[in-house]
Design a protein with these regions (language model features):
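Zinc-dependent deaminase
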Residues: 1-35, 108-175
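Small-residue (primarily alanine) positions within well-ordered alpha-helices
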Residues: 28, 32-35, 45, 56, ...
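Short beta-strand scaffold segments in enzyme catalytic cores
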Residues: 43-52
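A short, polar/charged loop-to-alpha-helix boundary motif
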Residues: 63-75, 80
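Conserved redox-active cysteine motifs that mediate thiol-disulfide chemistry
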Residues: 99, 103-106, 111
Length: 175
């Protein structure tokens, strides 16, 4: 069982990832590999229902042919979950993602009222893989800082399984 530091707008606590958390995080990583195999950026996110059944998932669609830079996996999965779950269910839902949500996606997660985020690859580690690639400009703004500015808390667990998540990025951002 992996132990991580959980942070929300109010406090930090030590929390262990469950076997279900690890299973769903690995599924998000697998979906990021599938996104890459389709010629997309190697990112993915999913939201399960209370029973652990995936009800929303998305790979990254922010590059051609769509060319919409807002179509990050986390934003798309959060929006799909918001269309399918009640406000109460969203507040107790978890979004699993192959990489730490950027500030745009953290805002979308917050506005969708998703109560918990579990991520694999940290923004800092991602930057070491992408460098200054023009298709992945980054902010030095951890999602925890975005959530900390809100009126309700979002529990954040991660990074976890970083080496597994990094494999989908190997060689993608070079050349």
């Amino acid at each position: 069982m992996a132990t991580l530091i959980a942070a929300d707008a109010n406090a930090a606590a030590t929390t262990a990832l469950s076997e279900q958390d690890l299973r769903l995080l690995r599924e998000a990583i697998r979906l990021s590999e599938a996104s890459r195999a389709r010629g997309r950026h190697p990112f993915a996110a999913l939201v399960p229902d209370a029973d652990g059944n995936i009800i929303a998932s998305a790979g990254n669609n922010s590059m051609p042919p769509e060319g919409d830079p807002t179509q990050h996996a986390e934003l798309a999965a959060a929006a799909e979950a918001a269309r399918k779950l009640s406000a109460q269910a969203l507040a107790s839902a978890t979004l699993y993602t192959s990489a730490e949500p950027c500030c745009m996606c953290a805002g979308a997660i917050y506005w969708c009222n998703i109560g918990r985020v579990v991520y694999a690859l940290s923004e800092h580690r991602l930057l070491t893989l992408t460098g200054a690639h023009p298709e992945n400009p980054t902010f030095s703004l951890p999602c925890r800082e975005v959530f900390a500015r809100g009126q309700h808390s979002v529990v954040v667990l991660g990074p976890a399984l970083e080496d597994e998540a990094a494999r989908a990025h190997a060689g993608f951002w070079q050349g």
